[in-house]
Amino acid sequence: MIEEQDGWTKIEAYNDRDELEQGWVKSSRIRTVTPNQTYGIIVDKMTQRLYLYKEGRLLTTLLCSTGTTSGGNSAINETASGEFLLCSWTGGFWSGNLYCDQAIRFNGGDLMHMVPAIYSGGQDENGNPVGTANYDICESALGRRASHGCVRVQRKDNADGYSHTWLWNNLRGQKDIKIIIWDDDGRKLRETDPATPMYYNKDGGKKYHTTARCASVKSRYLPLSAITYGDLSSYPYNQLSPCTTCGAPERPEVVAAWNSVIDEAYDELGLTP
């Protein structure tokens, strides 16, 4: 809220296109809500991670995908930044040929839901999915922008035993859980210590991992061989790409290039990042 005048209040908020807007509403329509004091959620559009907090402490981290900013519909697909409340457990819905299960609404058309699936038999006359669910396309995009505006959350349990299904089942009885969507504009990527252990499949693997027993790798190749993050700058490890299942950090040159762009932009403005 910015100011009040004659029964009207001027407010400022992001719209569904992630544009900051101001406008006047009747003061009588504004109510104060105390957010849930047990659980809270942060979705970071830069890291493409969902952070679940309990009583002020980080409980777990999940991979997610927010709205894509590429293509002709980038403004429409952008996930709005700001602070919201989880307001309704709406359940599964169709978005084209994608079935998005366990959806929880937090802002107009924006929902938080399980990573979508494509069903082999499509849907029946009642809108129910038919056949076998294939998550490969959307699951492989976790950790990157990929959605139409919603927040897609990982389906498989992480190392802590959490997934979107855990959120769906355990947060449902809670009221007014705050979800904060952090923007990525003007922010630098975190630099990883070169000595940080990474792992790869020496038998033709194409990705590097944060754990020697990543769930995305077939058991016959486990445990994976150890390298360091610094090794990724030299051959043959410079051919590897980050695994999104275990949340491997971006490659060193990607981080350096992004941060250089941010530094140059701030230099032009005479500011410090």
Regions found by a protein language model. Give the residues of each.
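A short beta-strand micro-motif
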Residues: G40-V43, A195-H209
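Beta-loop motif signature
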Residues: M1-D6, K10-Y14, G204-P223
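Exported/periplasmic cell-wall-interacting domains
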Residues: L20, N77-S81, F93-M198, D203, ...
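Structural recognition of the beta-strand scaffold that forms the well-ordered cores
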Residues: I41-D44, L50-Y53, T60-L62, L85-C87, ...
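Short, surface-exposed beta-strand-loop junctions and turns on beta-sheet-rich folds
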Residues: D16-E19, G56-T60, I118-S120, A215-V217
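Electropositive
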Residues: L63-S88
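SH3/SH3-like beta-barrel superfamily modules
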Residues: M1-S27, L232-C243
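A structural motif detector for short, solvent-exposed N-terminal "entry" segments of globular domains
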Residues: V25-G72
